[in-house]
Amino acid sequence: MKRNGFKIGVTLALLLLCGYYLYPTVRYALLQRKLNRMSEEERAAFIEANYGTIQSLRERALKLGLDLQGGMHVTLEVRVDALIRELATDVDETFEEVLAAARERARSGDVSLIDAFVEEFERRDPNARLSRYFRNPDAGITRRSSNEEVAAYLRQQAEEAVNRAIEIIRDRVDRYGVTEPVIQKQGTRRIVVELPGVDDPERVRRLLRGTARLEFRLMADPQLLQAALQDIIAYYEPDTTAASETSAVTDTATADTSLAALLGEQPSPERPRNPLLAVMQPVGQGVVFGIVAGPDTAQVNRLLRNPEVQALLPSGIELLYTANPVGTDEQGRPLYYLLGVRKEVELTGEVITDARVEFDELNRPQVSMTMNSEGARIWARLTGANVGKHIAIVLDNVVYSYPVVNERIPSGRSSITGLDSREEAQDIVTVLKSGALPAPVDIIEERTVGPSLGEASIRAGLRSVLTGLLLVALFMIFYYRTGGMIADLALVLNIIFILGILAAFNATLTLPGIAGIVLTIGMAVDANVLIFERIREEQATGKTLRAAIDLGYSKAFSAIFDANITTFFTAAILYSFGVGPIQGFAVTLMAGIAASLFSAIVITRIIFDYLVLERKLMVSVG
């Protein structure tokens, strides 16, 4: 054994190292089993008393992927078209047409949106300059800048927007409290987010998708808004008779402002023929343009986007919905106010220095915000100049509240009210503290795995590993006798090494990762098969067992090493360019290759040398 002293030392050191890294996983699993046997009261008391230990074990334990413990996998895409529009300092009809055409080209082809935008712009007018729309001296874009310089500026801004979005989303997820999230860039404008253990998908969607564009705006002049409402209703009247009927309906709506009337609960003898009144209840007073049921908002938006209808609205006014329902109709559908709000933004969320959840005198949640000195100065001027008027607090283009200013507010404090729950208030605080996304993001792919499905995946994965291990072990013993038993022992150590490597590098075990372990079991046995066959060939030529073992390992090494190193490089490529499940498979495959090479070449050789040289036994390899 002296000749193998170093190998034995390395093997024992690796086993101890694997034991060190796997100990938290084993202890955490036993602790989870213990907690599952406790009652709710006992569990709560135990967690409170041992919170530090439990948290430490959770952080050091081998992590399970979404497919094993449940959670959400979301792919986000940054809206580059919205970023381009925001970067533009001058937007006209030509700009919108070019952007729309570029959007269609980018959606149907391989060209990027920015390249398509520049090409479409130059196709329409080869002599025109993009700098007309994107003049920004601070960024080096002047009216003399070439289209190539503007395109480079847009690409740089798009890349920075994606990177900034990743930072903001990571901060939001951290504040949400997800353990071991995975957030990474995919391609040029996509972001992959994996959130293990989340159980409220809708809340997560709001958290990820919200741009957190907080704005303070003045409301429309009530008289001008209601006059525009009458004009728009008249525009959609099918004939003169219907217009007269609509006038009567509007007069009734103006006179009856009870809650039942506002929520559309008054009886109606027949469905109005006016397409707008069919999906919107006009209020006829104040800053409320109308009341719309949730499912009808898309139809109302389509009717109001008509350019001729937009021209009837007061200049500088747009219509925004309230964030939360104001009631329900007779069918139980949520109803929302459609409000007239000025487009001009008086203050943004950039002046907010602190946000926190508080409760009013009726114990309703609200978000209290504190502004910096500059924001407080503007807020004092804004409130002082608009006493008796509404100021809308707009977050991501929906109105959370529009309080009436009673007096000048010099303290720089404001609040978002009308929230449904503490969780909603906390989510708003989270996005405000994390900052606004540089551009809107869309969820283009979403997968949710429930905890029960994750448990089923764990059971299926363990069953596949144990079944594969048992079948391979039985075959090796049956075919290679003592040599097969040695290979089986090395196989068990191989699995311990794989799990130890994953735990040491803080990797995540996924269902494809378990598939990689099963594949590695076969590859490890394949290496032993090559060695044993070479030993049998040498014995067939009359070599002694000791000489046959030496030559068998020597001749099989090159084939084993070449095959494994090639597979390792393939796994490395998969890890570099893949995402999610592919990376999980690649990680365990690379760990398995390293472990199987060591166990097949080193560990089995130590055991052979011990049995043949030390114990002088005749070991059979079939």
UniProtKB/Swiss-Prot annotation:
Matches recorded under InterPro entries: SecD (IPR005791), SecD/SecF_arch_bac (IPR022813), SecD/SecF_CS (IPR022646), SecD_1st (IPR048631), SecD_SecF_C (IPR048634), SecD_SecF_C_bact (IPR055344), SecDF_P1_head (IPR054384)
GO MF term list: protein-transporting ATPase activity
Membrane topology per record: Multi-pass membrane protein
Transmembrane segments annotated in the record for this chain: 6-26, 460-480, 485-505, 512-532, 559-579, 584-604
Subcellular location: Cell inner membrane
One Pfam family from the record: SecDF_P1_head
Entry keyword annotation includes Plastid: no
BP GO annotations: intracellular protein transmembrane transport; protein targeting; protein transport by the Sec complex
One GO cellular component term noted in the UniProt record for this chain: plasma membrane
Lineage: superkingdom: Bacteria
Sorted UniProt keywords: Cell inner membrane, Cell membrane, Membrane, Protein transport, Translocation, Transmembrane, Transmembrane helix, Transport
Assembly information from the UniProt record: Forms a complex with SecF. Part of the essential Sec protein translocation apparatus which comprises SecA, SecYEG and auxiliary proteins SecDF. Other proteins may also be involved.
HAMAP family: SecD_B
Family to which the UniProt record says this protein belongs: Belongs to the SecD/SecF family. SecD subfamily.
Protein's job: Part of the Sec protein translocase complex. Interacts with the SecYEG preprotein conducting channel. SecDF uses the proton motive force (PMF) to complete protein translocation after the ATP-dependent function of SecA.
Protein name: Protein translocase subunit SecD
Source organism of this protein record: Rhodothermus marinus (strain ATCC 43812 / DSM 4252 / R-10)
Gene from which this protein is expressed: secD
